Amino acid sequence: MSSPPSDVAALPAPPAQPVPITGRALPNGLAAFLVFFSSGAVLVLETVALRLVGPYVGVTLQVTSSVIGIALAAIAYGAWTGGWLADRRDPRGLLAPALVLAGIATAVTLPVVRYAGEVLRGGAASAILLLVALAVFVPAALLAAVTPLVVKLQLADLRRTGQVVGRLSGIGTLGGITATLLTGFVLVAALRSTVILLALALALGLVGIGLGWYLRREEPTELPGPARARAALAVLGLAGAGLSTVAPNPCDIETAYHCARVTADPSRPSGRTLLLNSAQHSYVDLADPKYLEYAYTKWIGAVGDVAAPAGQRLDALHLGGGGFTVPRYLTATRPGTDNLVFEIDGGLVELGEQELGVRPGPDLRAVVGDARMLVAGEPTDSRDLVVGDAFGHLVVPWHLATREMAADVRRVTRPGGVYVQNVIDYPPLRFIRAELATVAAEFGHVALIAPPEALAEEQGSNFLIVGSDAPLPLEAVRARLAEVDPKVSLLSGAALTDFVGQAMVLTDDYAPVDQLLATA
């Protein structure tokens, strides 16, 4: 008797599973190099991007946070996209194009940021985010796609998945660390941002082309995209590199900290203006060091003029050199004065000697280093006058704004000596109020010099804090201010107390200066 037909035999065969499109694994050394190199290139971009956008939007906490955030977003998007593509195409055909495209995008970044920066100047959050995105996102995303492509190629044995992924992830992290340290300690100090980025673009292009040649020799692989599109991209990269040489460059020189430029004053042949990150920072008259152009330097000069009898030498300490305007003024008005200048940027010291009439000698000494660290090493009761002029219009070294710093300045200042500190703030004037409260926490007598419009919160301005452990010669200061800047106001006593209100005292533990400076 025959058996009934089987239902199982009648079922259709299951569909065939798709075969992953994956080429042969790369040699371990090549795979490690590609991950190390591409990850390091992302961190070079991130580090240099801060210098690239700084002349247009400043180097504030918000700008730094934007660079880090946009770079991380690009890494996340690139890694995700690279992994998605690796499951749909042979990664061997994508690696070389990713590197070449990253090189092209890096070359194009320079002119794009410099032209866009002229339009997006300022500290608005939208301008910061857009300019940073233009500087970082596309090349960083392309480079971040390299690691998942390499990982997919190397996963030949599922039993070693954890080992392969862990090893390549570690190599990528090591590449980023190496690039960060190399860029921060060596490249930025030695080379202009233009040179660093163009060299990186060239290196990416050459590595991509070399990798493409190697992979096609080992196993013929079709490059993605039509030939015309690839040719157009090559032309775009060359055009980007060429435009970088003619795009508006806000720097004459790039120091380790600043984009610096010196311009001549057309109305005063011996006048020179120092611009740092495209903002006016200092003005000097090469022929007449007693000439003070900016209002706040006139205020400092007025306080210095009455700090001791006319012509008497002083022991002065300057926290920040810039254009060395005030040290030159004191040297001219009080012969024999010992001007000790702490300037963190050695490039500015060299620029001052070359173009701003700075003549180092027994009466003018410049020490390169961080003012906070250097003040800590100064003898107690060693200075008659301390001038704090290290704050910019968008950049404030917060560690110089705290009560601990003010206490160290008070320690260095002789009994009856004077501390003057230049601060720039904008309505609603949260930072200047906090800094006044901070200085007043250490100095028993404090006054404020500022334009009346700024005190009324109608405009941003320089503010000059004057502090001492002895009563200030307020009437003498007022009389001298009336000669050099009749419209300026001098606030002290109850009026100053009302102005400060309940402002916070800044400390090393909590000094949110960037947030206090925000105008929104």
Protein language model regions, located:
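Glycine/threonine-rich flexible loop motifs
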Residues: 394-401
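S-adenosyl-L-methionine
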Residues: 349-380, 385, 394
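Alpha-helical transmembrane segments of multi-pass membrane proteins
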Residues: 2-253, 264-268, 278-281, 305, ...
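A cross-kingdom signal targeting lumenal/periplasmic-facing segments of multi-pass membrane
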Residues: 315, 323-334, 340, 345-348, ...
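A short glycine-rich, Lys/Arg-flanked "PGG" loop and its adjoining helix->strand segment in the class I
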Residues: 402-415
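Extracytosolic and intramembrane catalytic regions of membrane-associated proteins
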Residues: 286-316, 326
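Soluble small-group transferase modules, centered on the S-adenosyl donor enzyme superfamily
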Residues: 216-283, 289-293, 303-306, 450-520
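Conserved glycine-rich SAM-binding loop
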Residues: 318, 322, 393
